[in-house]
């Protein structure tokens, strides 16, 4: 039967910041009466509901704050794609033990094979596990650091970048860096080394990163620290990005970032 809560109870729940319980409590009480659930067990169920809700809300906020692509999650990776990589290694990375061990991840491969997708998917898992994550393209990172020098906020920005549990730098080493940018990246790699996890995606192997830095000694020191504490995930194969192209269907356009499983076209009767 339908049950309404007493206004006094609703007011008390809201005062304790338990307002969301109001929507589910009547159903839980009805279930408890039907199944002869004790008050203690009912209280546990109700509080478990609220804990789950708060965890879900917190995870959603962490994902938003991280700047992750919302659709680049493990469940949406198209397993039929002709992109090749070490599935066993990626499964290990999905366990997030590398985050707990403060190890790094280097994701290498040509343009369009899904490096960003797999990096973001790891970021989503880390957010769900209550880790703080930041995803940022390398060019945007360097812009923020340049701006921070101008407005005297560099120390605060560097502290933020060094303290986040998982920092994902996308498309690193595409363009040469200035002397200041090289020093910034050196400091970032060195201060995060063995203290927090860094995921880097790049089209270039670490040996090709050296000319990108303005200072060869800084480059060698930074790269050596990063790569010797990193898992290497190497991707190869056909472009995964082509699967994210907009497609026409009876249901309208698919959301951006959602892969389309391609099928072989069937021959019409008239073509036979």
What are these regions (language model features)?
Residues 166:
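Walker B motif beta-strand of ABC-family P-loop ATPases
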Residues 1-21:
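Charged, compositionally biased N-terminal leader segments and the immediate start
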Residues 65-79:
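Conserved adenine-nucleotide phosphate-binding loops and their immediately adjacent elements
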Residues 85-163, 210:
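Conserved P-loop
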Residues 14, 18-69:
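Interdomain "pre-motor" coupling segment immediately N-terminal to P-loop NTPase/helicase cores
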């Amino acid at each position: 039967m339908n049950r309404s809560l007493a206004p006094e109870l609703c007011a008390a729940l809201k005062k304790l910041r338990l307002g969301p319980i109001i929507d589910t409590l009547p159903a839980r009480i009805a279930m408890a009466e039907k199944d002869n659930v004790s008050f203690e067990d009912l209280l546990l169920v109700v509080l478990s509901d609220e804990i789950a809700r708060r965890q879900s809300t917190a995870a959603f906020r962490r994902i938003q704050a991280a700047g992750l692509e919302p659709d680049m999650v493990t469940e949406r990776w198209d397993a039929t794609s002709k992109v090749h990589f070490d599935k066993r290694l990626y499964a290990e990375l999905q366990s997030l033990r590398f985050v707990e061990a403060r190890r790094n991840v280097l994701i290498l491969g040509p343009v369009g094979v899904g490096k960003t997708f797999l990096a973001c998917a790891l970021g989503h898992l880390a957010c769900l596990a209550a880790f703080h994550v930041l995803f940022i393209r390398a060019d945007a990172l360097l812009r923020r650091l340049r701006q921070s020098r101008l407005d005297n906020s560099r120390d605060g920005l560097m502290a933020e970048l060094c303290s986040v549990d998982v920092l994902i730098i996308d498309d690193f080493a595409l363009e040469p860096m200035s002397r200041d940018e090289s020093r910034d990246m050196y400091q970032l790699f060195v201060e995060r080394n063995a203290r927090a996890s860094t995921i880097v995606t790049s089209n270039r192997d670490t040996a090709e990163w050296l000319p990108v830095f303005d200072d060869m000694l800084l480059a060698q020191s930074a790269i050596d620290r990063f790569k010797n504490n990193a898992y290497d995930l190497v991707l190869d194969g056909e472009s995964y990005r082509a699967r994210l192209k907009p497609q026409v269907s009876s249901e309208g356009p698919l959301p951006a970032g959602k892969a389309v499983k391609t099928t072989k076209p069937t021959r019409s009767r008239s073509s036979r």
